[in-house]
Design a protein with these regions (language model features):
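Flexible beta-alpha connector loops of hexameric P-loop NTPases
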Residues: 57, 138, 142-149, 213-224
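P-loop NTPase motor core
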Residues: 84-89, 97-184, 279, 283-289
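Structural recognition of the conserved hydrophobic beta-strand(s) that form the central parallel beta-sheet
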Residues: 131, 199-203, 228-232, 242-251
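Substrate-engagement module of ASCE P-loop NTPases
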Residues: 160, 184-194, 219-245, 267-276
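Conserved P-loop NTPase "ATPase switch" module shared by AAA+ and STAND
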Residues: 193-223
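C-terminal helical "lid" subdomain and adjoining coupling/linker elements of P-loop NTPases
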Residues: 197, 214-215, 244, 300-419
């Protein structure tokens, strides 16, 4: 058995600048879609600038497919679902997916640096409307810089499509907070956009609908009007030539904060025309972590060397206890699978990723991909700065003696106030 000493990952891996420096604000990993759409200068450049965003983004198979389909819809190609539902776990890549769609539609050439995206459709000038249901106030609406107020989700969507041509089509509907019918929405998507493609991104729909129930409108409520609009919108987009709608819902009833009935009702409103999308699955989280936390691609020779060394040790131990030829073959096969997975995960030990994905996800507070990024970034910064890194960053290498890392871990698990 080889006695070669493996180099610590911190001596081999180049970290992303904000991980290296430890400048890890919540805004770096928690994407604010509405702020991105508004080009808010407070949004980190890595999220606000399309080229920087896609340089730091790993396109999973499902995200690639989603981008390809939506851009094709906006180009006017047929045979694609124009209404798509994102159903992801809390922190499971939903906001990042919506931001990817926003940047791709607004600046298609930002994808040109990604080989697998070079043949995606180029729809030209796209009118993009973003509705953030967590931020948009159901009672007071949204006040513009000129003092005017947009009262409803349909008013805000129309304003973003075109304040001069689209918004007047629903101005009275917005004022009275009455949902426009299908004919008006159809005009909104065509005449209101001056014939340009239209992409509508709806985030946190459930949260807005829940608050809208408290706003009375004669014998109705804003929630009822919003549900009518949502259903009409999905139907009209589904039958359009150059429009697409992507909306998000929570993954489960537990994440719906007890409003299971409303979740099911919203789900049903678009069930005839929408199609489910899950942007991140399985081990696709590994290159996502690498792309965002590392400043360059992992060193292939180092990854190969480390994974082969682990394979040698684990296979040797299993073969030592194998009693039959079949068990020895199984030990060899499991060793190869471990080697391949470790090489793909480098500089992370797959066991650490599995703990977060399979155990921590049972904790309501843990935000999946986003939480993993924040926690791993704090670990890598600490080990790079203070030393102590091993060949891989695994469960046994987490620097829990570092106060910042320990606080970050407890916060991600929602128990920071218990200690």
């Amino acid at each position: 058995m080889s006695t070669h000493v493996l180099r610590p990952w911190a001596d081999v891996v180049k970290l992303h600048p904000d991980v290296e420096t430890g400048v890890l604000t919540e805004a770096v990993f928690a994407i604010d879609l509405g702020a991105i759409a508004a080009n808010d200068p407070n949004v980190p450049v890595v999220n606000r600038d399309p080229e920087a965003f896609f340089r730091a983004t790993y396109l999973t198979a499902d995200l690639r497919k989603l981008l390809e389909e939506v851009l094709a819809c906006l180009k006017g190609k047929s045979g694609y679902n124009r209404v798509l539902k994102l159903r992801t776990p809390f922190g499971g890549g939903k906001s990042h997916t919506l931001a990817s769609l926003f940047h791709a539609a607004r600046k298609r050439e930002a994808l040109d640096g990604i080989p697998e995206a070079k043949d995606f459709a180029r729809p030209g000038n796209v009118a993009v409307a973003v509705f953030d249901g967590e931020k948009f106030d159901a009672r007071n609406g949204k006040t513009l810089d000129d003092g005017r107020t947009i009262q409803t989700m349909w008013g805000w969507i129309a304003w973003q499509i075109d304040p001069e041509k689209a918004f007047p089509l629903v101005a009275e509907h917005d004022k009275d907070r009455v949902a426009p019918g299908g004919d008006v929405i159809r005009d909104l998507l065509t005449k209101g956009a001056s014939g340009h493609p239209v992409l509508i991104l709806l985030d946190e729909v459930l949260k807005y609908m829940e608050r809208a129930a408290a706003v009375g409108i004669l014998d109705s409520t804003l929630q009822r009007q919003a549900k009518d609009f949502f259903q009409n919108l999905t139907v009209e987009v589904a039958g359009s030539e150059k429009a697409a709608l992507v909306y998000s819902l929570t993954w489960s009833a537990r994440e719906a904060l007890g409003n299971v009935g409303l979740l099911a009702e919203i789900d049903k409103l678009a069930s005839r025309v929408d199609q489910l999308r899950e942007p991140v699955s399985g081990d696709e989280v590994l290159p996502i972590l690498q792309r965002r936390l590392l400043g360059a691609a992992p060193d292939v020779p180092s990854a190969t060397e480390v994974s082969a060394a682990y394979q040698e040790v684990v296979t040797g131990m299993q073969r030592a206890h194998a009693e039959t030829a079949s068990e020895r073959r199984q030990a060899d096969e499991e060793g190869r699978l471990l080697r391949d997975r470790m090489r793909a995960a480098y500089p992370f030990h797959p066991a650490l990723i599995d703990i977060m994905r399979e155990r921590w996800t049972a904790v309501d507070a843990f935000q999946r991909t986003r939480g993993a990024l924040r926690f791993l970034a704090s670990c890598m910064h600490s080990l790079k700065k203070n030393g102590g890194a091993k060949a891989l960053l695994g469960p046994g290498e987490v620097p829990v003696k570092d106060v910042d890392v320990r606080v970050k871990m407890l916060k991600e698990l929602g128990v920071q106030n218990d200690y």
